Amino acid sequence: MRGGYYVLTALFVVASSEIAAESGHQLQANNHGRKIDDDAAMKSLSTRFLRESRGVHGNVANEERSVYSVLAGMINEGIKKMPRTAEVLKRKSRVIDPSDKIPHEAKLVEEMFHAAKAKETMESAEEYNELKTATEDAEKALKKHWNPSKTAVKGDDSHDIHSNEMLSVKNWWVDFTGLKSTVVDDTQDDMVDSVHNAFVTVCDKNIKPTREETSFLSRLLNWKVANSPRSVHKQRLIQRAQRYVILDLWKMQNTCKVWPEWEKLSDTLKFSVLDYLLNLHYQRLVRMYNIFARKRPDRNPAPLNPELNLVGNTGTSAAMAVNKNSKGQIPYPSEPLNAASTSKGERFHLIKRSKRTSDGNTDIASLPSIRSKVRSSKSVMPLLTESTTSGDHSVPAKRSRFSSSGLSRAFSPYKPGDHTFITENSRLSFDGPRSAVDPYTQSKKHSTKALAPSSTVFTPEDVDTKLSLGGIYDRST
């Protein structure tokens, strides 16, 4: 090795001297000049000695050409490999160092790749339409969420929840007690329907809020929270979006041809699909919340929207039961106090009575001839979350107990070796039917109606069905 080193050094010196002599410059003694001359020699070796040598004849010229051509090829190949070698070494050092975190951009690219791969894999399933149906309505609504709403352009946006946040299933703080069914008392159906119809009038046509969602938003905005009401409301919306994702999982698991395809996916791909579903539902809920907070259809009469046909072919809102007169004219629904209309000689008076309750709600208008008993808003809206309100204080309800009889495990504590993802106080896995939970509980005071996403309709029998979450665990100690 030492002999080869001296040979290479001598060759570099000779070549550099010849190049410098031809160009009329002498080699400089400082390091900077030496580096420049060395670089010039390395770059010119591959071309200078491949042509015929000048002033050299016979075998000596042939020998020089062969030696220098081989040497020049080796040097050039080494130069080309140096950047790649440095890059490989840099990558290895990053992998070895556990404290070095992957940049956010790299994570984003990786997640996008997995999401695209998951979508491509799921589309190959025989019954992919079942999964597609579960997300179709929410996906259509999401397309307009990033643009201003046509029906909610005006209004106070100080209470809006911004939708520029992407949620992740891995970061769930899951409270499964919030999965109990939403119920509405039969005696209050008319009141809920009127508010719901008014809410539909002020919403974009692609949002399509349900009765239960309308009741949920009304109770949420009337819930008196002393500190940070917006952040508390945001958490409730996130929990509801999580509920919708689990209902989608439940529907997919009950489709025998889809679930085996789902179980074939890796956990990474499953989380990508669930992240997609979670954000679709969350963005839709945020849009509904902001419109409801601005318009307050539970307090203010809704303007007529001719684009939405809610009562026959009249194009009027079902929330405002205003009769036409003989000329077919309709009084503006926000007329104060009395709105009178004449039809066939008979005169009807619609009196708008606004009675403020103790918790700030307003009762619905009623005809004076029919004195219907209207309860306060505390009993009007259904129990939607785990806590109930009493005045200005929140009273937490008891945690519902989940039974896993007949199943191998449900809500089991963490055990070493389990292939699950650990969150703050929950575990999320995909073990299929061997883990199940019955999140619904029957209410003695209310008739049960299962809450479902806008794209899914559940019957009362679904309330009694055990909901298998595909291995999503949580147990309170």
Curated annotation (Swiss-Prot):
Transmembrane segments: none annotated. Residues 326-345, 351-370, 376-401, 433-455 are annotated as: Disordered. It comes from the Eukaryota. It is found in: Secreted; Host nucleus. A motif (RxLR-dEER) lies at residues 48-65. One of its GO terms (cellular component) is host cell nucleus. Residues 1-20 form the signal peptide. Keywords: Host nucleus, Secreted, Signal, Virulence. Its main location: secreted. The RxLR-dEER motif acts to carry the protein into the host cell cytoplasm through binding to cell surface phosphatidylinositol-3-phosphate. Belongs to the RxLR effector family. Secreted effector that acts as an elicitor that induces cell death in host plant cells. This is Secreted RxLR effector protein 102. The gene is RXLR102.
